[in-house]
Structure formats: C-alpha cells, structure tokens
C-alpha cells in the first residue's frame, strides 16, 4: 500500500516533467514512506479530450466549452480518478501549479470523492492561492471551506507533507518558509515515475535540446518590483549553496541522461557568490556538457566582471530571460529595478560576446510611463 500519490492535473506546459511530484516523492521516501508521482497533465495534452475549447476553459473559466467536449472531459477525469484510487494510497495529493489547474482540480476532487467518499485528499501548490474574481477570495479557502478536501498545505510543502504522513492530521497548514539549511539538505528530486520521453521544451527561445529537467536553486527574489507578486509568496529570499546546486545538476544528468536544465528561480544570479560557485563546480567537473537557462537580473560591471560571463558559458548557460522592462531609467526606478541604461548596454554585450542568447521582458503601459519614456524604450 502506498502512503502518498502525488497528482498533477491540467493545464501546464509540457516542456519538462513536473518538479513538485519529484521533490515531494524524494522528501517522503527519505523519511521511510513510499510515494508515486502521476502526471495527468501529460496524459491530457496527448488525449483527444484536449480540445481547444477545453484548454481555453481551463485557462479562462468564463469561456465555457461545448457541452459534448465537457462531457468527454468529465468522463476522462473519471477514468483518471479510478486509476488513482487503484493505487490504494493513504493520501492523494493534488498539486496546483498555477490557476490554470484549479478547474481541473475541482473536477478531479469531485470524481475521486464520488467514487470513494472516504479517500483522503490533500491540496498543495502555489496556484491554489490565486483569487477567484467572482468570489474575491483565495481559491484554496473556497475549497477548504466547502469541506470537500481533507487537508491543505499552503506554500512550501517539503516538510509538511512528511508531517501529514506521520500524523494523518486533517487540517489547513500555512507552511513556514524553509531555511537555507533546510533547502540545502533536501534530497535530489526523484523523476523515476515519469516517462521523460513524453516531455519536450516547446519554448521557441530554447536551445536546441528538446527535453529539459527543472531545477530550483533559490526561492524568492532580491528585488521587490512594484508590479510583481513574488514577494507575496516568498517574503524572504533564500539561496541554496552553489556547490549544492551544481552537484544536483550533475547527479540528475548522470541518472537520467538529460543535459538541458531549466531553472524555476525568479533569478539565477540573485546571490552572485553562489552563482559563481555553481558555475565553477560544473565547469571544473563537466565543462561544455551541461546546458541551462533561467531568469536573470541586469547587474553593473562592478558586481559581475567579465569572468562571471566566462564561467556562465563554460558551465553551459545558453539563454537568460531578463526583466529589462523599460528603456526609461525613470520608469525602472519607480519599479525598483535598480540598474542603469549603461548596465543594460554592458550586460547585453557581455552576454552576446559569450554567445548566450537573451530574451527581454518589456513592460508597456506602466502607470508612470510617459510618451517620452516609451520613446526611450523604442
């Protein structure tokens, strides 16, 4: 008998296997429990029920699908629920990655409880905290107050899911942020339950590799930009040790044979010390073998000398996504970005010299932006 089944539900992109299931599986198995990860999102996107109107509805609930397609979707969910229940797990954990998984989660929960009212369901994931516009309340509060789920873990579940299995408590847990030491001591994620051949990086800005492996080096952000909600989820920025991250990358490469890694971090160079340590660790042990991409913040030359860009290239950095946001320093200052146009120029050329591709995020229509500010961006 399994202790835990970790379920991913639609809708998510399929550029990499879900990280939550792999992380939680390794955490509970390290403590002597057994778990299985089941990705029904990858099954969905390869199934005839994934019609355009169903996908749109999952992402935008005020766009109802055709009745026949909705019935087919519900029947598919019911078959998935039967398969989940056949695992005979003590707990069924459903991971809600973004708000795009909320509607599917509701369908899965109803189907599971219809088939077995005594099954124990715990919800988790950052997507459960998004608000429902028509109710003005967090979605997870609506689910909990309805009484249809047995437990909820809000925020970081790596420790709390182990406590759930130890004590079988049916409660709403507002998890505390993990400390840096706790992040460094997490086991390497276990992707054994996923068919990795089914995943592919469909991002048009990706490198030539097709299958990517997700990895988390930090949680939170060193900035608190006015338009961003990252600080509301992770108030304190925490960074794993760079050697720890580099070792995990190499361990995953050696185990699964995938050499392309995608960071889930808000930024990969928040801690320059650990960013250097990671790049040095990979360069020293496996130069020009690994490829990775991630989100990046523009920094002045005094913070990131040329050697840092050399290390990025030798460690395998192929693409960075940068929140440049605006060509106007006045707009960026109001946002809290804290870099100059000279910093942008220097960062751009330094990355280009190392043949590291760049994808910029540009913010048009920021509240303080004037026509002159917009012209600076152009």
Predicted regions and their residues:
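Residues in well-ordered alpha-helical elements
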Residues: 159, 184, 243, 261, ...
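Short amphipathic alpha-helical segments and helix-helix/interface helices
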Residues: 25, 106-110, 140-144, 161, ...
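Alpha-helix N-cap/loop-to-helix initiation residues
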Residues: 13-17, 101-102, 271, 301-302, ...
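Acidic, low-complexity intrinsically disordered segments
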Residues: 2-257
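Radical SAM [4Fe-4S] cluster-binding motif and immediate context
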Residues: 189-366
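Short low-complexity, flexible loop/linker segments enriched in glycine and/or proline
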Residues: 50-54, 169, 278, 335-337, ...
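Short, function-defining helix-loop hinge/capping sites that tune catalysis or transport
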Residues: 47, 133, 158, 273, ...
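Catalytic cores of alpha/beta
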Residues: 308, 368-378
